[in-house]
């Protein structure tokens, strides 16, 4: 099986001044994940590395760069899933952690549970020796400004939630195993303790070697209502291609609950899709040593991986 990785940097509205950074960020993440696959590494390792790369990138609403809750604090959710045995690990409402996706994987591999939240997740992180990151180090000036603006009496909640950020990755490795990973800071100015779709298995992501893997982004409550990631895999199990399955599921979410979002998908044959019903979604994929990436509907730039690696080392 030829390895494939697909990543997304969140569906919604990407402001012009952030386009270049967002595009470069998903390309970097895809190249890092593909590097692991190319060396014979697992899909699980590849998606974790890709998502970790975006958590460390302030252009995205995950890890450093996460939006703030109503109290001006960062609370993050993440999930990772192994399609080989349906094992999954997730964390929700976690604070002071630089890479929630790493903690989610530890939940999967070091506990009998699938989801830890808030204080319990914090205690587990301490037990696992994960260093605590001061909350201020996860807050960017952009996130702080958005939080302040959204507190204004005349602010429009629907307007500021158009900038829906989440990061994710799906992959298939040489052994034919699939995996997914998703991480987010959630909704801006959300209630303390709010948990969205990302940490919920079947909503923020799902992976099963029998069909494929999906990672979602968009309005979390809508995604949870239709269990979007699992719905996409169901459509593929009925014979749909990744692209058709993604489009069908997104259309259902839009017509049934009025929700917009985006998805990345890979099936167990290595076919992939990156689809969205929002205005934009940054995405990138590598297959057959070819990098493809874009932000707008219909946009698809392509370059050889070797050339992309040189460009990335020179600052894209």
Where are these regions (language model features)?
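Alpha/propeptide regions of enzymes that mature by internal proteolysis
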Residues: 1-316
